[in-house]
Structures are given as structure tokens and as C-alpha cells.
Regions:
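Short amphipathic alpha-helix that is part of the acyltransferase structural core
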Residues: 1-22
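Short glycine/proline-enriched coil/turn segments at helix->beta-strand junctions
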Residues: 40-44, 84-87, 108-110
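Acyl-donor binding region in acyl/amide transferases
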Residues: 56-105
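Short glycine-aromatic motifs
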Residues: 36, 104-107
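Active-site rim helix/loop that mediates acceptor-substrate recognition in acyltransferases
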Residues: 15-36
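Conserved catalytic-core motifs of GNAT/GCN5-like acyltransferases
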Residues: 93, 108-118
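Conserved donor-binding loop and adjoining core beta-sheet/short helix segment
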Residues: 32-69
Length: 118
């Protein structure tokens, strides 16, 4: 079993909250192409992607699931990798509960994303 398949339940659970923007296959293809990165842990995983803005590059946590402490541990490795790729910031999109959980880890809320069907 590959790491991606082992992490599939966490990825699919996170996708259920992602606004129906991607399927598991989309994520698998993104990882295979190098446009997304898989950060596996024994009891969780995260998926990141680099976002290039005119003034900076961000390593964006696109999906995360599993045990919170393991997710916190893996962000250190992801941040180091992101710095090596020229990123100056790490961002995350997720449910509102992440704000409370991440504040103690030095994260701050800089914007809110809202959605309306059209």
C-alpha cells in the first residue's frame, strides 16, 4: 500500500469540507505531477501546494486530517521545505475550528473566505 492510499481516508474526510473543489483523484494527480505535496504521518496527513503571488510565495496547506499533534509536528518539516522553495509564509484553509487550534501554535487569522452559489 502506498503512502497516498494509506492516507486516503484522511484526505477524503478533508475533501468533504473543501467546498467540492477536488476529488481524491484530482489530489492524487496533483501529487503525482508535483503540483501538490503529501506530508504523511503515522496517524494523519496534510497536502500542500505552492501559491505564487506577485509579492511572495506561500506554502498553502490545502488539506489536513488525522491527529492534531501529528499535524503540528509535520508542519515544521513542511515549513523547512517551503523555505527551501522560496516561500516566505505558510497558509491554511479549513474549518473555523482550526483558528482556535492553531492560534497557540503562532498562527493568526489574516482573512476569511466565504462562498455563495451563483
Amino acid at each position: 500500500m502506498t503512502e497516498l492510499e494509506r492516507c486516503r481516508p484522511w484526505i477524503e474526510a478533508a475533501l468533504a469540507y473543501s467546498g467540492d473543489t477536488h476529488t481524491f483523484q484530482d489530489v492524487a494527480d496533483g501529487i503525482a505531477s508535483g503540483h501538490m505535496q503529501l506530508w504523511p504521518a503515522p496517524k494523519g496527513c496534510a497536502v500542500t501546494q505552492i501559491v505564487v503571488y506577485p509579492k511572495k510565495k506561500a506554502l498553502h496547506i490545502f488539506l489536513a486530517g488525522g491527529e492534531m499533534d501529528q499535524l503540528f509536528d509535520m508542519t515544521e518539516s513542511a515549513m523547512a521545505w517551503g523555505r527551501g522553495q522560496g516561500c516566505s509564509v505558510m497558509t491554511l484553509s479549513g474549518r473555523m475550528g482550526w483558528q482556535r487550534a492553531l492560534r497557540s501554535e503562532g498562527w493568526k487569522t489574516t482573512m476569511v473566505v466565504m462562498e455563495k452559489d451563483i
